[in-house]
């Protein structure tokens, strides 16, 4: 009985070992993103809305898959956040903003390191270079949040040739620069809209639905077959051991009857 229980436990652990690698193929850099990204809302509310932040924007971010631009975009975000950090002195009145930006810099630097470890192959990059632009805090951290969200589902999926080239027939990108006239302070509630750029999110949603269905199919099917195979082995083992267990019980009953007979004879 103990051997049967041991085999069942072994089968369960085997399924876990087979299933976990399949699950962890999704979001290759996901564990580098900490809860400190939630402080972006607070930071945007603290900065004047007319404050301009320089960022080299990667062309095609709104129309191409994330693996086409995420590596270069996160490097440019690291440069811009580091420059922004240098503009805040590490003193009491500026400590809140300084601390938040410092944590964001560490997150982005970790993501840069992760992307260096997981380089995309067979990807034909666009010949266009990042364009220096001026963004308000809301626009800048909207790009930051979009990049962070891209890491949650980022995979090494470029097994075939993937051209990351902007079509010449596609409409020109909307200029993200914002006029400095008539500045006003950004209420904290408005910062929650950073993640919701309607035009880009709709395109992202349509692409992500198709990608996620394929990803889950790739994960679920091998896991299902591994579970079936594991339980089949367990059933065969149990069936093989069942006659031995039956014979053991019968032998035990015979021995008990023999002992009772011998005790009666002795009396």
From Swiss-Prot:
Disulfide bridge map: 29-114, 68-164
Localization annotation: Cytoplasm; Cytoplasm, Cytoskeleton; Cell membrane; Cell projection, Lamellipodium
One Pfam family matching this protein: SCF
Signal peptide positions on this chain: 1-25
GO molecular-function term, one example from the UniProt record: cytokine activity
Residues passing through the membrane, by range: 216-238
Gene Ontology CC terms, in alphabetical order: cytoplasm; cytoskeleton; extracellular region; filopodium; lamellipodium; plasma membrane
Topology feature Cytoplasmic, residues: 239-267
Membrane topology qualifier: Single-pass type I membrane protein
Glycosylation: residue positions: 90, 97, 145, 196
Domain of life assignment: Eukaryota
Topology, Extracellular side: 26-215
The record's account of how the chain is modified after translation: A soluble form is produced by proteolytic processing of the extracellular domain.
Residues modified to Pyrrolidone carboxylic acid: 26
PANTHER family cross-referenced by the UniProt entry: KIT LIGAND
UniProt subunit comment: Homodimer, non-covalently linked. Heterotetramer with KIT, binding two KIT molecules; thereby mediates KIT dimerization and subsequent activation by autophosphorylation.
Family note: Belongs to the SCF family.
Stated name of the protein: Kit ligand
């Amino acid at each position: 009985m103990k051997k049967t229980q041991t085999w069942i436990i072994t089968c369960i652990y085997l399924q876990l070992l087979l299933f976990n690698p399949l699950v962890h193929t999704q979001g290759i850099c996901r564990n580098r993103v900490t809860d400190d990204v939630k402080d972006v809302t607070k930071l945007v509310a603290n900065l004047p809305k007319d404050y301009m932040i320089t960022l080299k924007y990667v062309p095609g971010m709104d129309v191409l898959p994330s693996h086409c631009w995420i590596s270069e975009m996160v490097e440019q975000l690291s440069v811009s956040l580091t420059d922004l950090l240098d503009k805040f002195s590490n003193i009491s009145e500026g400590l809140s903003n300084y601390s938040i930006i410092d944590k964001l810099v560490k997150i982005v630097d970790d993501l840069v390191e992760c992307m260096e470890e997981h380089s995309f192959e067979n990807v034909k990059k666009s010949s266009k270079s990042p364009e220096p632009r001026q963004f308000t805090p809301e626009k800048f951290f909207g790009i930051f949040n979009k990049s962070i969200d891209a890491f949650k589902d980022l995979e090494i999926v470029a097994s075939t040739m993937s051209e990351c080239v902007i079509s010449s027939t596609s409409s020109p990108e909307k200029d993200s620069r914002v006029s400095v006239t008539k500045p006003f302070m950004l209420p904290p509630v408005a910062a929650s809209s950073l993640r919701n750029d309607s035009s880009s999110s709709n395109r992202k949603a349509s692409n992500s639905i198709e990608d996620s269905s394929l990803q889950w199919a790739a994960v679920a099917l091998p896991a299902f077959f591994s579970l079936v195979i594991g339980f089949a082995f367990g059933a065969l083992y149990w069936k093989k051991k069942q006659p031995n267990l039956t014979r053991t019980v019968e032998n035990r009953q015979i021995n008990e009857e023999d002992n009772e007979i011998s005790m009666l004879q002795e009396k």
